[in-house]
Amino acid sequence: MIVDVRNAAASAVAFLFVPLLAFAGAAEGEKKAAPCVACHGEAGNSVNPQWPSLAQQPAQFISTALFMFREGNRKNDLMTPMAKPLSNADMNDLAAYFSAQKAAQPKHQSKPENVAAGPGLAKKFNCSQCHGPRLLGQQHIPRLAGQQHEYVLAQLKAFKAQTRADIDGNMTSAAQALSPQDIEALADYVAGLSAE
């Protein structure tokens, strides 16, 4: 077997320094996150049911969402002007910071019938296929567990109405099968889940 020493050395250096870069990005992101706190809460834990929590969201999801707001692919009267001046480095720093924050325990109390029906609905509509088995998100796909109820409800309705864009079209497609009752039950269910 031939081993390319240069590639092995480069891999070792990357393995050692990538965590340091993420830490540096999180430190820079904390400085840049001051304006975000007004809506998204201290350390990214929103207390307003209409605005999403960013804490413990996958970094790639956060940076992708900011990019989509900046480029006009995703629209929001508050977020679009906030994202417009951000550089790619700013977005990555903010993403590193918020993804490193611990999500608060949800305050939302899901209805017992939705707690019972939620896992079956999540399986039926393939939520866990993309969002992960515990709905904690991965890569460019957001954490749903413990997210604000009203926010999730509004996003699911927007995907169904095709007024919200997503990067690969999967959510727009998946939402078409949801009834209004399914949307309410799923939003209520995921809002009560722990992000731990």
Where are these regions (language model features)?
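Sequence/structural segment immediately N-terminal to covalent heme-attachment motifs in c-type
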Residues: 25-43, 106, 110-133, 148
